């Protein structure tokens, strides 16, 4: 072979040779070109109150005694100016932030119902002995029975909160009363100046000497007004909602209207029969809301697993509601729209607690299903379906903290209770995308957007406060959630755990002393979460 031929063959082999380094470089290029899908972060609450972070769930952060930055079974929330109020049921107190918290777990400024932040006893530990004279029942078996005793500056199981005409009202549920301060309290343990439901601030007997009337209360829960004039109170264990047409001026001021009963002296669930449910009956109502612009009244009828809506504020006792949500009609009262306690669904409710309404729609805390439901428009038809669920990944889920025991996230809920909605209209440069469920069977979500060429309406800037009672915290949402997709095996829905089949959510361990012959909660019919 000539030298020229050998040279050509060598050049040909060199041209086809690829070094190991070059091969590695090509592999790296292939890897760089592969697109890694970005994980969509699930939207959750933006702020937590009562815990150091979103993962914590223990009452009083696991300590034996409370502090200025802890909560135990928080129930309701109120905001007035820059001030924030929370009813801390487990610690028998109301805590106040004089400046709205900006960081997780910020300490509060004031405490009502206790002398200081380390105290947590019901009525500050005051007790009395129940006998024939004090009970008014004439039952000798009650002689010597010890009960908690109220005084003017004590609180027992606080519930609803509202600032009305610049004055703070607190539903002191365990003392069967509503107390009012002459303004906004400025000192720890400051005493209120007026009481509803009792003759004076030292009494705490259920139904005011044992007689049901227009001025008595029995474990009241929610309170609301929107016009600093009409006051509504959910009188839970009297199975009615009381309405005052004007601001009370003295202790024991009588209400003007009763909803859920035919008269002011009646107090039976569903007017005497659990199955006698109708548009004018109630069973353990817990939440109330009055929208002054539309004059609509909203009542959470917890024992009947529904929300009732009156299109105009009732002027007379016993007026029937116009719309029902959570049931297909006014004659139904089954949990989860008749599907039972085991199965959450889009159309039903299971022991709901509170309702709030604004320009952006309606929210209901569906406590037994560990979720909050959202309607983009206030319902106008019976059984109208919600558009979005908060706290769960789908309408069919109901486990506390999505089944992870002892650990929460910014997106989960456990026993959600009272709520507060604050709205402010503001112009935004970009369109805020609002996640809404599709109507298909896969429960996929889509984004409601404005088509090109259309003018974008001002999007609501809001804060939704949720008293997440089971997680001993209050969470604040400022965006509607876009639930992340989770792969889930087809498995049977597990029944919610109940401690006492006969105890309602928000109910108390005290016996009902005034209806011995009444079976208010038949076994297995009204379980508590």
Please report, for each region that a protein language model flagged, where it lies by residue.
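Beta-rich catalytic cores
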Residues: 70-73, 90, 107, 154-157, ...
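Short loop/turn segments immediately following beta-strands, especially the blade-tip
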Residues: 97-105, 181-190, 245-253, 310-319, ...
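Short coil/turn segments that connect the beta-strands within blades of beta-propeller domains
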Residues: 82, 166, 228-229, 293-295, ...
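An edge-strand/N-cap motif at the start of beta-rich repeat modules
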Residues: 30-56, 77-79, 84, 463-464
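Signature of short aromatic-glycine-proline-rich micro-motifs recurring in repeat-based ectodomains
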Residues: 61-79, 125-165, 209-226, 272-291, ...
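Blade-level signature of beta-propeller repeat domains, shared across WD40, Kelch, NHL, RCC1
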Residues: 370, 418-426, 457-491
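Short loop/turn segments immediately following the C-termini of beta-strands
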Residues: 89-90, 99, 173-174, 183, ...
